[in-house]
Amino acid sequence: MINQTAKKILKALSFDGVEVEAFRHMADLKRLDPMKIFYKKVDEKIYNGSHAVPIRIFFPSEKSFRESEEKKHDIQDKKLLLFIHGGGWVTESIDNYERICARLANATGQYVVAVEYRLAPEDKFPAGLEDCYAVAKAVYSGDFMLNIRPENITLIGDSAGGNLCAALSLMARDRGEFMPNRQILIYPATYNDYTENSPFVSVKENGSDYLLTAGKMQDYIDLYARNEEDKKNPYFAPYIAVSYTHLRAHETR
């Protein structure tokens, strides 16, 4: 239960409308969070056609970093989290999620690879998804500095990142180039309609007064889509896929 004081504050901050630049500046404030744990990172790029997709690799320990550099150790049996950040396909970055990814690596003992996919509205669907797919394909196929067995790789993403994890898994199944074994989808945005026409009771009951409003969600959807036809594409909204056969097990939080 939310106490009454907190509820009043949330209600005051719950408004519709997405101001792209203002929201991006607010998201950047995450960088002020001080890090008090060891972490080592390396920035690399993976190409999606002619576009270089920045990625950031987080190492769980100094030893794991040395092993990857020296290439004297077989790291295929190590584990890796391929992390896709949230932000409504419009805000956030691997810089803003650095603390989360570093803590994930530290807490799990796994490598973490974060993807800097292109954002809407400058680059609408499916640009960001194709960036994530290109990175996933390289990581799962071993065409990458960390040669980890595919069965030891987990896709993980929150909100819009959860959407992109689910969508690229559908895309991977359909294209037949690789297949993720595991997904962790953290409150994934998998549908295409947060208006009064939404079939979900939760949108009607909780679509206001809780900071992220249904109106904001719909604005993010509209900023991401090029047109109404995009919204009918299961790669845009994985919930509407006709079939989920031949997809591996996933976990939703």
What are these regions (language model features)?
Residues K78-H85:
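Short beta-strand element of the alpha/beta-hydrolase
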Residues G142-M145, E151-S198:
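Primarily recognizes the serine-hydrolase "nucleophile elbow" in alpha/beta-hydrolase
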Residues D174-E228:
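Hydrolase active-site cap/lid region
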Residues L223-V242:
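Active-site nucleophile elbow and catalytic-triad environment of alpha/beta-hydrolase enzymes
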Residues T245-T252:
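Conserved small/polar residues in nucleotide/adenosyl-binding loops
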